[in-house]
Curated annotation (Swiss-Prot):
This protein's encoding gene: atpF2
Subunit structure: F-type ATPases have 2 components, F(1) - the catalytic core - and F(0) - the membrane proton channel. F(1) has five subunits: alpha(3), beta(3), gamma(1), delta(1), epsilon(1). F(0) has four main subunits: a(1), b(1), b'(1) and c(10-14). The alpha and beta chains form an alternating ring which encloses part of the gamma chain. F(1) is attached to F(0) by a central stalk formed by the gamma and epsilon chains, while a peripheral stalk is formed by the delta, b and b' chains.
Function summary: F(1)F(0) ATP synthase produces ATP from ADP in the presence of a proton or sodium gradient. F-type ATPases consist of two structural domains, F(1) containing the extramembraneous catalytic core and F(0) containing the membrane proton channel, linked together by a central stalk and a peripheral stalk. During catalysis, ATP synthesis in the catalytic domain of F(1) is coupled via a rotary mechanism of the central stalk subunits to proton translocation. Component of the F(0) channel, it forms part of the peripheral stalk, linking F(1) to F(0). The b'-subunit is a diverged and duplicated form of b found in plants and photosynthetic bacteria.
Superkingdom field: Bacteria
Protein's UniProt name: ATP synthase subunit b'
Membrane topology: Single-pass membrane protein
Compartment(s): Cellular thylakoid membrane
Keywords assigned by UniProt, alphabetized: ATP synthesis, CF(0), Hydrogen ion transport, Ion transport, Membrane, Thylakoid, Transmembrane, Transmembrane helix, Transport
SUPFAM superfamilies listed in its UniProt record: F1F0 ATP synthase subunit B, membrane domain
Length: 153
């Protein structure tokens, strides 16, 4: 019995060179073709589609980023121009208001000077009139005093 066991042990080792080895090789090759046709090609196609999608999305994102940066710089330039225009309008308004202030001040000063000059002329006229009246009264009083002195003698 032992000899039968030893005799049977020589078969069925690691590699048996009988019909199973080529059959296994054919099965592996056939399985490779089937997996390639049914699994690897569709998966590869999906991976390529996703890679194309990611690439196109990345390119679109770069274009949109460039467009956004361009729009941002345009808006910054427009804002800068608007600020400069607003500052120009403010400066012009300040200049106009300063000119109006100076004109109003000059007009008020001229009116005040005219009123003062008119008042001075009126005062001079009244003073001259009062002096003339005073001279006239002094003359009359002097004549009256002379008459009374002459009459009392």
């Amino acid at each position: 019995m032992t000899s039968l066991l030893l005799f049977g042990a020589s078969e069925g080792g690691l590699f048996d060179f009988d019909a199973t080895l080529p059959l296994m090789a054919v099965q592996v090759v056939l399985l490779t073709f089937i997996l390639n046709a049914l699994f690897f090609k569709p998966v590869g196609r999906v991976v390529e589609e996703r890679e194309d999608y990611v690439t196109s999305s990345l390119a679109d994102a770069k274009k949109k980023l460039a467009e956004v940066e361009k729009l941002e710089s345009d808006l910054k330039n427009q804002l800068k121009e608007a600020r400069l225009a607003a500052q120009s309008v403010i400066n012009e308004a300040e200049t106009d208001s300063e000119n109006l202030y100076r004109e109003a001040l000059a007009l008020a000063t001229a009116e005040a000077n005219a009123s003062r000059e008119e008042a001075r002329r009126e005062i001079d006229s009244q003073r001259e009139s009062a002096l003339n009246q005073l001279r006239s009264d002094a003359e009359k009083l002097g004549d009256l005093i002379v008459e009374r002195l002459l009459a009392s003698k």
